Amino acid sequence: MAAQKINEGLEHLAKAEKYLKTGFLKWKPDYDSAASEYGKAAVAFKNAKQFEQAKDACLREAVAHENNRALFHAAKAYEQAGMMLKEMQKLPEAVQLIEKASMMYLENGTPDTAAMALERAGKLIENVDPEKAVQLYQQTANVFENEERLRQAVELLGKASRLLVRGRRFDEAALSIQKEKNIYKEIENYPTCYKKTIAQVLVHLHRNDYVAAERCVRESYSIPGFNGSEDCAALEQLLEGYDQQDQDQVSEVCNSPLFKYMDNDYAKLGLSLVVPGGGIKKKSPATPQAKPDGAAGMAAEEEEDEYSGGLC
C-alpha cells in the first residue's frame, strides 16, 4: 500500500514538472495545473507516511500558487507543509511555516484564517517553547481584537497570561491580566472581571508589590457588583493578612473554594503565597489569659528577690 502511494506521488510530481516546462509553443508555465499536481503528490506521500516528501511537495505547491498570485492557496500549502514538519516532530520549523502562512492570510484579507493558524501554531509549540507560544497567542489576540472579535481575543490573552504565570514572568503576566480585565469590562462580563482581579492580586503579591495589589482592588470598586461580592471580601481579607504578616489568615483565604477552583496556574499561586518575613501564627484564645498569670509570676519573683536577704 505504502509503495503504491509513493509511486502515485512520484507520478504526480512528474506531471507537475511537465506543466512547468516551457517550449516553442508554450511560453508560460501552467502554475495552476502544476500546483494541483503537487497537492495530489503531497496527499499521496502523506498517506504513505513519507512526511519529508509530502512537505517538499507542499512547498512546491505553495511556490506554484505564489507564482500564480493565488495567495490564499499558497498560504494553505505552507500551512500543510508545517503540519508535515509537525508529524516529523520538527516543531520550531513547523511553527515558522505556519507563521508565514498566517501573514499571507492577512495579506489576502482573511484575518480569521490567519488567527486560527497562529493559534494552532501556539498549541504546537506550547510545551516546547512557552515563550514563543505566548508571542503567538498575543499575535492571535491582536488579530481578533482588530476584527472586533473581543471574546476570541480575550480567550487567547488568557492563554498567554497563564503561560506567563507558569513561567513566573510576573511583570508581563500582570500587564496581560490587566488587558484581559479591560476587555471583560468592555463586554460587560463583570463576574469574570472579579476573577481577574483575584489573579492580578496574587501575581502582584508574588512580585512582592503590595501597593499594586491593593490598587487593583481599589480600582475594581468601580466595577458594577464588585463591592460587596465574595471576591471583594476575600481579597480584602487576603490583603489584611498579608499586610499584618499573618500567614494563617492568608493561607485560610487561599485555601478557600473561591481560590482553589480558579484556573490551576492561579490556584497554585495562592497555595504557594508566603507573607513577608515568613509570617506569624495567629494567637490562640488561651494566650491572652496566660499573659496576666505570667506577669504576676514575674512580679512575685521580683518581690522575693527584693527581700531574699531577710528583714534587718
UniProtKB/Swiss-Prot annotation:
N-terminal signal peptide: none
CDD domains, alphabetized: SNAP
Modified-residue entries (Phosphoserine), positions: S284, S308
Compartment(s): Membrane; Golgi apparatus
Domain of life: Eukaryota
InterPro entries named among the record's database cross-references: NSF_attach, TPR-like_helical_dom_sf
GO cellular component: Golgi apparatus; membrane; mitochondrion; myelin sheath; synapse
Single GO BP term: vesicle-mediated transport
Keyword Nucleotide-binding included in the entry's annotation: no
SUPFAM superfamilies in UniProt: TPR-like (SSF48452)
Biased composition (Acidic residues): 300-312
Region annotation Disordered: where it falls in the sequence: 281-312
Disulfide cross-links: none
Tissue specificity remark: Abundantly expressed in the heart, liver and kidneys with lower expression in the brain, spleen, lung, muscle and testes.
PTM-bearing positions, type Phosphothreonine: T287
Record keyword Transport present: yes
Membrane topology: Peripheral membrane protein
Keywords, in A-Z order: ER-Golgi transport, Golgi apparatus, Membrane, Phosphoprotein, Protein transport, Transport
Function: Required for vesicular transport between the endoplasmic reticulum and the Golgi apparatus.
Record note on quaternary structure: Interacts with RAB11FIP5. Interacts with VTI1A.
Family: Belongs to the SNAP family.
Protein name: Gamma-soluble NSF attachment protein
Species whose genome carries this gene: Mus musculus
Name of the coding gene: Napg
